[in-house]
């Protein structure tokens, strides 16, 4: 699933491709992608102009004229790309926005898990996906005091806690494995048992890793591409994710992989301390 750096990279690369364009028509090949009534979705967006694209957590927020916002969640495999309307339809393309300038934006999704929800601008944080999201890294809301307090109330392990989007939004499996290794915290550690100084380390590592990964245009380990069809660069900087069975770059111990709540989790059994 694209995590915050990947979704932000999609936003940055997609914006210059579609900003200022007006929708002439919309073709929906797979209606379940649309949360609204598909006919109403088409009717409301036809002749509307894309003003800009914002992002919150892993959600893209397409801002349209007449105070409309399309909340787009890419989920596991969602991708946007610009084509000409006569371009042959791909097997996994499910929605097409045809613009008045003769170009078209298509949404492709192999697993069909992605969703688009049209709402009034200003109400997007009331939608099901965004309503309960916690703060983003590198924001005032995500303070070290907030983070220490949030973890002190969590009985579950730290891996699951960091994946909980109500605690901090935008992190996924890749970056959680990385920041726990950087902070030398075992993924099965009880969140509330981690010492305050280690939580501070973890806090700074989260902010730094998200910043660097975004600068590197995200991580491509499976199918992730930006709006230009380019891969990310942070996969070349990964220390543990995808490196199970290799030596830890800190101590030389062989990295191990376990399942944590069904998620593959790679860690160093020597460097990463288990707090119970």
UniProtKB/Swiss-Prot annotation:
Signal peptide positions (record): none
SMART domains tied to this protein: Fapy_DNA_glyco, H2TH
Gene Ontology annotations of biological process type: base-excision repair
ZnF (FPG-type) ranges: 239-273
EC numbers: 3.2.2.23, 4.2.99.18
Keyword DNA repair appears in the UniProt entry: yes
Chain's role: Involved in base excision repair of DNA damaged by oxidation or by mutagenic agents. Acts as a DNA glycosylase that recognizes and removes damaged bases. Has a preference for oxidized purines, such as 7,8-dihydro-8-oxoguanine (8-oxoG). Has AP (apurinic/apyrimidinic) lyase activity and introduces nicks in the DNA strand. Cleaves the DNA backbone by beta-delta elimination to generate a single-strand break at the site of the removed base with both 3'- and 5'-phosphates.
Name of the protein: Formamidopyrimidine-DNA glycosylase
Taxonomic classification: Bacteria, Bacillati, Bacillota, Bacilli, Lactobacillales
Name of encoding gene: mutM
